[in-house]
Amino acid sequence: MMKSTTTIGIAAALAALFAAAAPAEAGQCPKDKVLTVPRDIEGMDGVGISRETLATVDLKGWRGVGGLFLRTRRLTIAGHGIVPTHEHDDRPSIVFIVKGELIEHSTYCSVPIRHKAGEWTPEFGKGHAHWWENPTDQEAVVTSSDIVDQETVDLDKPKMDM
């Protein structure tokens, strides 16, 4: 009897350990893992990522806005690729996962967040920073719509060789 109780206890402990280390499901941070103060996260460099600007809309004159643009991009992340660490303090964004699976490492969640095709996530707020990884061998594709300034739009323009 003692052996089976011990075995069950060890199995339960291992299950709890793996559950704590496993990414969150359903594309959002579990309520009990949401942080009220942002944590430090790794400063990751981008690996295997390509970005294509699909459209840019000048918001000049709309509700008194000037110098800001609504931009939509397509990002393709290679298998085992990384979207670098970046902030959304001053750049609201909505990301839609078109294809594949990504894991987000966020300053406001104590566990990694798993995102799958068909899911979306808002990105904005003081202290909001994150990086994404593609844990699979297959490419992942997302669209990202954000509000950016003229300098950011200029960075998106193709460089002309003269």
Feature-to-residue mapping (PLM):
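Short acidic-glycine-tyrosine-enriched beta hairpin
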Residues: 77, 108-127
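Bacterial N-terminal signal peptides
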Residues: 9-19
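A short beta-loop-beta micro-motif enriched in histidine and acidic residues
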Residues: 65-68, 80-96
